[in-house]
Amino acid sequence: MPKMKSNKSVAARFKLTGSGQLKRTRPGKRHKLSKKSSQEKRNLSKQPLVDKGQVGMYKRMMLV
């Protein structure tokens, strides 16, 4: 049987922390930044944790 493949789009979007939680990036920080205030850009830089209900699904996709 061949090896299982992880979902590469999920693996690129989420990072696993040491305690097993997942961090994600906020959308809207790639382009058209001149229209956004410094405060908005700073808040977009923060990486929130994924909700508890979705963590299991994403971990299965990442084969963690």
UniProtKB/Swiss-Prot annotation:
Matching InterPro entries: Ribosomal_bL35 (IPR001706), Ribosomal_bL35-like (IPR021137), Ribosomal_bL35_CS (IPR018265), Ribosomal_bL35_sf (IPR037229)
Biased composition (Basic residues): 23-35
Any GO molecular function: structural constituent of ribosome
Disulphide-bridged cysteine pairs: none
Pfam families linked to this entry: Ribosomal_L35p
Chain intervals for the UniProt region annotation (Disordered): 1-56
Gene Ontology cellular-component terms listed: cytosolic large ribosomal subunit
A biological process from GO: translation
Sequence similarity: Belongs to the bacterial ribosomal protein bL35 family.
Protein name: Large ribosomal subunit protein bL35
Gene: rpmI
